[in-house]
């Protein structure tokens, strides 16, 4: 007994594990698989963990998840789904400026609060005009004013119930013959708050609620569908107008200024300067240009992997930094160009520097599972950008196909020859637009179907919350505070430890995550 008994009770606890500073000052470049976080003390449930985190200096998300601006990951469908679940999507720019701006517009109009620029028709318009508007915009609850414009007198409204059973030969009828007349409408006065208007709409059991001024002129409208979205998606990321947040990628060339203008006109909330190596005079000049022309527009710079790179972009005025070079599953930059940095080291080093200036960091690349997300956030990142993890979800662009009985979607790096051949923007990202010989920095592949974002992202959220619970932190802010104070401890993993930490010693198994 004397061999292992020590007097004095349990007041003595030996120092265990490494601080983040000790872990990353060893001189080795570390990936997310090279270390683990040591557990802490639990006195709360996982669903109490607050995942609120900063995307930029002025934009805060309730979920620290961001979809990558890749043409096989984020267009309007993905951006809408990400915003509804508390994150944000960045529309790719491997397309025409007009297409990209229209995708942003779709996101901004998906949920609107007070709609101040609705589709409006006049009594002399015809039924076929309603069907055309429905085909173009996806709805047919349209207010009718005497001139067919906003700001003129409200005379009625057309809903699906008014036109559902009309025969084709009736499509030339005037709307004044079939619309619901003004005297039968429920309206709200101008100056009403959104909360009051929603309550009126709820009581009325109508699909739309027109807002009129003292002269009975239409000034806005709200939709019942938005009430349902508010109920179903309480974490949704919204701007001051109650529209969904949406980001977009642009390049750093002169013609990207035209793209920027269209995006700003469409209502984009934040732009990311999409470059494989962000520490360039081209990006610095573009940051300054955007800040001068659109001072309220948030700008994310990158990509960077060192404090020296980050310094130049912070000095130029960025509102956040995107960190990662060559760590993505489809990226071969490190292999081909011998430049880059292991992602865990890059995230820690840049985050530790950028926090001194209040600049949030987005960890971009190398995310293979929810554990990697938790590790990136514990190393100082405020949000995590995902490509392959979200590819092949229902909301990702592209069609499913089958190979050996497995349902797949195409996924490619923006530095792949495939993407470069599609549009010049991909070449600009890798400074290759003038090269006669293209050097691919990415590959094309396929990813297995993951189902809908509306099921997959809640799984990721729950995983992050459980990770924070095991750490003993009730919020991501507390996780980062524990890391910087040295309270949060880490441990390096040998290759054998990594094998031990995975599934092993089984003849066969099925791995279902959610």
From Swiss-Prot:
Entry keyword Phosphoprotein: yes
Binding-site residues, NAD(+): 274-276, 324-326
Outcome following mutation: residue 351 to Y: In mycophenolic acid resistant cells
Modified residues (N6-acetyllysine): 511
GO biological process: 'de novo' XMP biosynthetic process; cellular response to interleukin-4; circadian rhythm; GMP biosynthetic process; GMP salvage; GTP biosynthetic process; lymphocyte proliferation; purine nucleotide biosynthetic process
Protein localization: Cytoplasm; Nucleus; Cytoplasm, Cytosol
MF terms (GO), sorted A to Z: DNA binding; IMP dehydrogenase activity; metal ion binding; nucleotide binding; RNA binding
GO cellular component: cytoplasm; cytosol; nucleus
Ranges where the CBS domain occurs: 114-173, 179-237
EC number: 1.1.1.205
Binding site for IMP: 329, 364-366, 387-388, 411-415, 441
Residue positions of the active site: 331 (thioimidate intermediate), 429 (proton acceptor)
SMART domains associated with the record: CBS, IMPDH
Necessary cofactors: K(+)
Subunit structure: Homotetramer. Interacts with CLOCK; in a circadian manner. Interacts with ANKRD9; leading to its ubiquitination and degradation by the proteasome.
UniProt family annotation: Belongs to the IMPDH/GMPR family.
Functional summary from the UniProt entry: Catalyzes the conversion of inosine 5'-phosphate (IMP) to xanthosine 5'-phosphate (XMP), the first committed and rate-limiting step in the de novo synthesis of guanine nucleotides, and therefore plays an important role in the regulation of cell growth. Could also have a single-stranded nucleic acid-binding activity and could play a role in RNA and/or DNA metabolism. It may also have a role in the development of malignancy and the growth progression of some tumors.
Protein name in the entry: Inosine-5'-monophosphate dehydrogenase 2
